[in-house]
Curated annotation (Swiss-Prot):
Protein name in UniProt: L-ornithine N(5)-oxygenase
GO molecular function: monooxygenase activity
Listed GO biological process terms: biosynthetic process; intracellular iron ion homeostasis
Name of the coding gene: Ao414
Pathway(s): Siderophore biosynthesis
Organism of provenance: Arthrobotrys oligospora (strain ATCC 24927 / CBS 115.81 / DSM 1491)
Chemical reaction(s) catalysed: L-ornithine + NADH + O2 = N(5)-hydroxy-L-ornithine + NAD(+) + H2O; L-ornithine + NADPH + O2 = N(5)-hydroxy-L-ornithine + NADP(+) + H2O
Amino acid sequence: MGQYSVESHENGEKVYDLICVGFGPASLAIAIAIQEMLPEARPNVLFLERQQQFVWHSGMLLPGSKMQISFIKDLATLRNPQSSFTFLNYLKENGRLLDFINLGTFLPLREEFNDYLQWCASKFANLVSYGETVTLVEPVKNNNTGKVDNFVVHSKVGGIEETRRAKHVVVAVGGRPLLPKPLPEYHPRIVHSSQYSSRVPQNLTDRNAAYRIAVIGAGQSAAETFSDVASRYPNAQTTMFLRGDSLKPSDDSPFVNEIFNPSATDKFFQTPAAERHQQLVENRATNYSVVRLELIEKIYNDLYVQRLRDPSGASWKMNIKNHTEVTGFKNLSEKTVGLQMTHRENGLETVENHEFDLVIVATGYARDMHQQILDPTRELLEDATVARFPINRDYRVQFSGEKVSSDAGIYLQGCNETTHGLSDTLLSVLAVRAGEVVESIFMKSASNGHSNGHSNGHASKVSAKKAEVYTNGNGHNGVTSNGYH
């Protein structure tokens, strides 16, 4: 497994065919696609990962939490149902296939899907350099052609700087935790949901203490942490703050779910920008600020039992305050946080100050970490002043054809929702998308070029003969989607 090999050099320096920045599900799907689509070409590939080991939503692997997506939308099945990297083959290899079938579900535990991802990642351990943070990607111009034909990838490992060169770079760094503006980026008592499982027990060590806990957010992660923390600390006062009027169920009905089909990406990309924005707004109920209905019903039942046992509300441990958002922050101590909460309803505004022992923030992620990493490459764009890096359908950054060789390029993963649709940050299209990226990098014809960036066909059309054309390479060590969708 993961046997990419044979080195290429330029002026005595090793040049990789591809370096992937980040080794989460997106890059892992690419690793699988390379192995299956290029069985003979064996390109020279390296994956760089900031974490010390493969991890996927480790902060939200809560007891009993399930996936929100069918296991069939794993890292390989939709591209190659016969792949050895399917979830079903993982079950077979681990002796649980029949037992899982007996469960009668398409939604495995998140814990099990994480184990599946780690199982896949272990096959490429020799192609990954863990504990390495990429800081910058710089273009390298060929003095003979005057065009950029490779890139220098700068990284740090334990304070030591590393540089490597690659013809192609895939940036799949996931999202960074997004906090409401009044809150500081770091405070020991403010925890983003992505760090929930590790930091909450560190901060709240007494399971029986009467802590004051706030949960900010209205989506799946907010609801899960609200329910879980109330269960972990039964004597705590836990309050959930929503900007809207209530927790709303996610829409995963069959017709709506078609927006997550791989073919929907083509349609969305070809849609005018104004219409794309409108479609994203219309379909927010599939992914943003929504909760699985069964969890909503559980929370409602918990609140109902409180009301049954104490109609006065004096002893209630769980509360939801709607139409309320954070408008101020005060650092009271290392163990206490002061929040100013503003309630707006029916044209009236009420401001309240609260003290909490812990604030859990589940307000999503920003998908902009690639901007700083790729800043030196902006000079290669037709317009270096644009806010976002423009990309083609095949996820390749639209650099000027006069500045960058057609045999070099940068690809973005998981930060293209405005051009490729709601599925871009999710698991839904990873298998097919990985095939498209691999085909664009290693199998593109001259007609693909920089002008349109479209891949001519999908993985099923790739032939072994096509694969033989490409350079062999010698690998060093073998991506986030953040959503569970």
